Design a protein with these regions (language model features):
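Glycosyltransferase-associated regions of secretory-pathway enzymes
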Residues: 1-74, 90-266
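Small-residue hinge/turn detector
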Residues: 75-87
């Protein structure tokens, strides 16, 4: 008999290095403890992730680590660690405002409203951050889920061929390519094995929007506070030009530098 695939009541987050955690992390941590009392909370770090193995194995991970691009180191780590585990990954700036158990048990109105499209048990959930992109501030997965395997394979080869590097764009690309996600941006894929929640569930306000209490809806379970540090010049020079070669790479880097300093002067 095959092992039953379930999403465990475990919360995972990534933290690299010995730097002091920001205040937003502790606010979110308290929300996890308060609203998810039955969930185990696990930190993914250098002690429980085989850094040496992956630094040797994956060039992109190694270069990000050497350049201290911790956001992208974290992206890679979350995918690989969660592939071997079952539970819910959350960013350190993802506040949880309601118990997620009804989602895991598929006992919310969303599933009832989509019942004509569902014939299988949910094995992976994630959410849209806007009308176009899937975001990765929170996702739930069963162990050895094929979606995360596809993402891992992207990091092995396609990462050097495609002009994308942020994990929302990587997930969106893989969903479009492998799971036939159309421009309609479906919520149910593979007869219910994959669920992509509308933005109101976890991203009630967008990256370029200002938070107001009015954005919280009855179906909102989390608030992503968008506490990122993605845009250093060092990061841009590496990430935006990684897929190019020769003169194209040189020209791209010149444009990146010019754009960066023009922005700084404004």
């Amino acid at each position: 008999m095959s092992e039953k695939k379930i999403i465990d009541k475990k919360i995972y987050y990534v933290w690299i290095g010995n730097a002091k955690k920001p205040e937003i992390f502790y606010k979110c941590l308290e929300s996890w403890k308060k609203n998810l009392p039955d969930f185990e909370i696990i930190e993914i770090n250098e002690k429980n992730f085989d850094m040496e193995k992956h630094l040797k194995k994956n060039r992109f991970f190694c270069e990000c680590y050497e350049k201290k691009l911790w956001a992208y180191v974290s992206d890679y780590m979350r995918v690989h660690f969660m592939y071997e585990n079952s539970g819910i990954y959350v960013d350190t700036d993802m506040e949880i405002i309601k118990d997620l158990t009804p989602i895991l048990e598929e006992k919310i109105s969303f599933f009832q409203n989509q019942k004509d499209k569902i014939s299988k048990k949910m094995e992976f959930f994630i959410g849209y951050e806007d009308k176009k992109h899937i975001s990765v501030g929170i996702f739930g997965t069963t162990k050895y889920n094929e979606i995360l395997k596809e993402i891992m394979e992207f990091y092995e080869a396609d990462i050097w061929e495609k002009p994308i590097w942020t994990i929302p764009k990587i997930f969106t690309y893989v969903f479009e390519k492998k799971y036939n996600l159309s421009e309609k941006r479906e919520n149910i894929l593979k007869d219910g094995e994959i669920v992509i929640f509308p933005k109101e569930y976890f991203y009630p306000y967008g990256y370029h929007e200002k938070y107001t209490k009015d954005c919280i809806k009855p179906e909102t379970y989390g608030i992503h506070w968008w506490n990122d540090s993605w845009s250093s010049l060092k990061a841009r020079l590496f990430l935006e030009a990684k897929h190019l070669k020769g003169i194209s790479k040189i020209v791209k880097k010149i444009r990146i530098i010019a754009r960066y300093y023009l922005k700084e002067k404004r």
